[in-house]
Amino acid sequence: MTSEQTFIAIKPDGVQRGLVGPIISRFENRGFKLAAMKLTSPSRSLLEQHYSDLKEKPFFPGLVTYMLSGPIVAMVWEGKDVVKTGRTILGATNPLASAPGTIRGDFAIDVGRNVCHGSDSVESAKKEIGLWFTPEEIQNYKLNAFGWIYEKE
């Protein structure tokens, strides 16, 4: 199995609303492996780096302020096509366009309070993981369930 990693963050609204467990369960139930996780209060500098591609957008200052408003659960998930599938699990950025059964479709209404963030490409995932985690914080272990989830190649 060819495995990749993605960065998923539960935003302050998701933490405050007690959605950490249900969100983690969605990824575990799908068959992905949790490789790193921490509850953190990021710096303004980290958030500005993380969202650097949105720096020129009018909503950027409000986004950074919102992300500073409470703790965030930062995670690295691993598995086959986890970036693409992770985005599907999250749902559309705008919760009103998200299908029922997705995290945002089930738990969010406003785009500015859409509960979580997920990397949009393998390249973005590598960048984001490098911003939020040191290599030592990412666990490399065998998840025995992978043998029951993936066909042998």
Swiss-Prot record:
**Family that this chain belongs to:** Belongs to the NDK family.
Citing just one GO molecular function, the answer is: nucleoside diphosphate kinase activity
Role noted for this protein: Major role in the synthesis of nucleoside triphosphates other than ATP. The ATP gamma phosphate is transferred to the NDP beta phosphate via a ping-pong mechanism, using a phosphorylated active-site intermediate.
UniProt-annotated binding residues for ATP = 11, 59, 87, 93, 104, 114
Instruction: Say which domain of life the source belongs to.
Output: Eukaryota
What this protein needs as a cofactor is: Mg(2+)
This protein's GO cellular component annotations are: extracellular region
Listed name of the protein: Nucleoside diphosphate kinase
- Its EC number(s): 2.7.4.6
Q: Which organism is it from?
A: Emericella nidulans (strain FGSC A4 / ATCC 38163 / CBS 112.46 / NRRL 194 / M139)
Active site residues according to the UniProt entry: 117 (pros-phosphohistidine intermediate)
Which Pfam families does the UniProt entry name for this protein?
A: NDK
Q: Set out the biological process GO terms recorded for this chain's protein.
A: anisotropic cell growth; CTP biosynthetic process; GTP biosynthetic process; nucleoside triphosphate biosynthetic process; UTP biosynthetic process
The UniProt keyword set, sorted, is: ATP-binding, Kinase, Magnesium, Metal-binding, Nucleotide metabolism, Nucleotide-binding, Phosphoprotein, Transferase
Reactions the enzyme catalyzes: a 2'-deoxyribonucleoside 5'-diphosphate + ATP = a 2'-deoxyribonucleoside 5'-triphosphate + ADP; a ribonucleoside 5'-diphosphate + ATP = a ribonucleoside 5'-triphosphate + ADP
